[in-house]
Amino acid sequence: MKKLWGGRFQKTPEKWVDEFGASISFDQNLVAEDITGSLAHAAMLKKCGILTAEEELKIREGLNTLLQKAEEGALEFSVDYEDIHLNIEKMLIDEIGPLGGKLHTGRSRNDQVATDMHLYLKNHVGHIIELIEAFQSALIEKAEANVETILPGYTHLQRAQPISFAHHLLAYFWMLERDKERFQDSMKRINKSPLGCGALAGTTFPIDRDYSAELLGFDAIYENSLDGVSDRDFILEFLSNSSMLMMHLSRFSEEIILWCSQEFKFIELDDTYATGSSMMPQKKNPDMAELIRGKTGRVYGDMMGLFTIMKGLPLAYNKDLQEDKEGMFDTVKTVEGSLQIFTGMIQTMTVNKDVMKQATKQDFSNATELADYLAKKGMPFREAHEVVGKLVYTCIERGIYLSDMPFGEFQQASTLFEEDIYTVLDPYYAVEKRMSAGGTGFKQVEQALEKAKACVAAGVC
């Protein structure tokens, strides 16, 4: 089959060469963006007098017909035409005749594909931001219902200090807020148009790049044609931001997995977000959380794959850049799916408040309160730390907790202890008295919730 670029060649590629070099199996994901970019390019060519009004109308009608067919899933792509651009061009020529070949005036597939990917990420990053905000809203809703739900806070996966469950949930809210800000900031780089950069050096046709950029909703154009067609830093930035987001989701997933285990029993996942075992009838597995944790690795791989592709490429376009798309598509699908799943998982999970509360009474997470108690009475904190450490050791030796220790033994350790010490040992007291900004005190958590809600309402903090 004759290639659209085949004039210089005396032989056609072998079938397996065509198959190896073709990208239509995956870049057909760009069909809507490719047609959208072509519509803007045709309108610009008419404005600049390169196409007549009649020619532009026929091209526009043909492209809109193809776009409608694409939305209906009625387009049939062929490996014979390599990629999405040549497939659409061939379909347009079949639809309106040789005039379809005039559309490519003043552009190359190099700037065309870069434009497609800018449009693709522009749409999907906007959607990801919306999904992050939906997840944040779910966290706020769950946190509002659990301000006074207390559980052990952990360091080194060892019980450390009692905290509000709402405080724990809001920690992820703020991680997600920074993730959202990174995606929002990346739009400055995504929202630029490479259309009209040509193969690498621009074009001799009197085109208006600013006009086509305006039609496509871009804020600006690439100032250098070499840069516009050859760099993929905007994709790398997206992959990096996605990796950061997935890292946060993976950390949260790990906690979900722990919390719903029989060893913790802090939460129970809804049946709609769990699976069973083909052999063990009692099992209820947190597969969705495990998958999100696992899929984080593939997103990291997508990012490192493109970094590795880019590191040795001279200017300008190289065929290596065909490999920039599959990782991008994969990451978009993974991130969007993970956010949707996690939002539903949080909304529907059951919080076992009594189990969480009981866990704060069966440990020594209130030991810091004792040390602070002595320090507030004038004992140097290091000395107070030593005193309380010995009390903890005594309790461990006797198989009791600090709240079980007789008052007389507290006074033997230090005469600064008074009978109010048992109030101090109450986990609710420990949480309530954390009054510093950003702390787990109930009032501070209420204030944090109000700020979080304002951030979601405004779309930015």
UniProtKB/Swiss-Prot annotation:
Catalytic activity as recorded in UniProt: 2-(N(omega)-L-arginino)succinate = fumarate + L-arginine
EC number(s) recorded for this UniProt protein: 4.3.2.1
Alphabetical list of Gene3D superfamilies matching this protein: Fumarase/aspartase (C-terminal domain) (1.10.40.30), Fumarase/aspartase (Central domain) (1.20.200.10), Fumarase/aspartase (N-terminal domain) (1.10.275.10)
Keyword terms, alphabetized: Amino-acid biosynthesis, Arginine biosynthesis, Cytoplasm, Lyase
GO biological process: arginine biosynthetic process via ornithine; L-arginine biosynthetic process
Biological pathway: Amino-acid biosynthesis; L-arginine biosynthesis; L-arginine from L-ornithine and carbamoyl phosphate: step 3/3
Major enzyme class: lyase
PROSITE patterns: FUMARATE_LYASES
GO molecular function (one): argininosuccinate lyase activity
InterPro entries: Arg_succ_lyase_C, Argininosuccinate_lyase, Fumarase/histidase_N, Fumarate_lyase_CS, Fumarate_lyase_fam, Fumarate_lyase_N, L-Aspartase-like
CDD domains, per database record: Argininosuccinate_lyase
Cellular location(s): Cytoplasm
Record GO cellular component, one term: cytosol
A Pfam family assignment: ASL_C2
UniProt record similarity statement: Belongs to the lyase 1 family. Argininosuccinate lyase subfamily.
Name this protein carries in UniProt: Argininosuccinate lyase
Native source organism of the sequence: Bacillus subtilis (strain 168)
Taxonomic placement: Bacteria, Bacillati, Bacillota, Bacilli, Bacillales
